[in-house]
């Protein structure tokens, strides 16, 4: 079993991911979605957490061997980023969604040197907007952002477009395609449910029709 399938299995087992194609969730954006993900839950399960953190380390070493600093997005990327930095004996920083409105007004907490090669950690990619904003903020502070590594992606076309336009490399440990395949194999969803989940990936507006 691939790392992506192993992680997908764990996400389903610990209920970090819920699939309800016949009774969809409503996202904050208003989109009706057959999937809901809360990867913060992974922190409460040592086996799952260890699988994910080791996967992050292996992936970063394979794709970004020149990395000099790990950064986590606030708040979901902070605990994972801190653990990864510890495992790799690298500096760690985190990036706020916006600068503080008091004190020094920092958006990046921690010390990042000019030109330092950075990998940003995120837990979930939907459209990628928030982590790309974080990458832009880090670049403005002088960091050399090598890329983003995340636990999971919905594989939405908008995310691919956004990362391409930003010129930022994205790698994820698991993805929507792997997860729904595992879900069908393990009996979490029916054939009809799988069909709806596949339609959602292609068209987030009209998938129920």
UniProtKB/Swiss-Prot annotation:
Its cofactor is Mg(2+). 5-phospho-alpha-D-ribose 1-diphosphate binds at residues 96, 100, 102, 122-130. PROSITE patterns: PUR_PYR_PR_TRANSFER. Pathway: Pyrimidine metabolism; UMP biosynthesis via de novo pathway; UMP from orotate: step 1/2. It comes from the Bacteria. GO terms for molecular function: magnesium ion binding; orotate phosphoribosyltransferase activity. Keywords: Glycosyltransferase, Magnesium, Pyrimidine biosynthesis, Transferase. InterPro entries: OPRT, Or_phspho_trans_dom, PRibTrfase_dom, PRTase-like. Gene3D superfamilies: 3.40.50.2020. Its EC number is 2.4.2.10. GO terms for biological process: 'de novo' UMP biosynthetic process; pyrimidine nucleobase biosynthetic process. It catalyses: orotidine 5'-phosphate + diphosphate = orotate + 5-phospho-alpha-D-ribose 1-diphosphate. Pfam families: Pribosyltran (PF00156). Orotate binds at residue 126. Belongs to the purine/pyrimidine phosphoribosyltransferase family. PyrE subfamily. HAMAP family: PyrE. Homodimer. Catalyzes the transfer of a ribosyl phosphate group from 5-phosphoribose 1-diphosphate to orotate, leading to the formation of orotidine monophosphate (OMP). NCBIfam families: pyrE. This is Orotate phosphoribosyltransferase. It comes from Streptococcus pyogenes serotype M28 (strain MGAS6180).
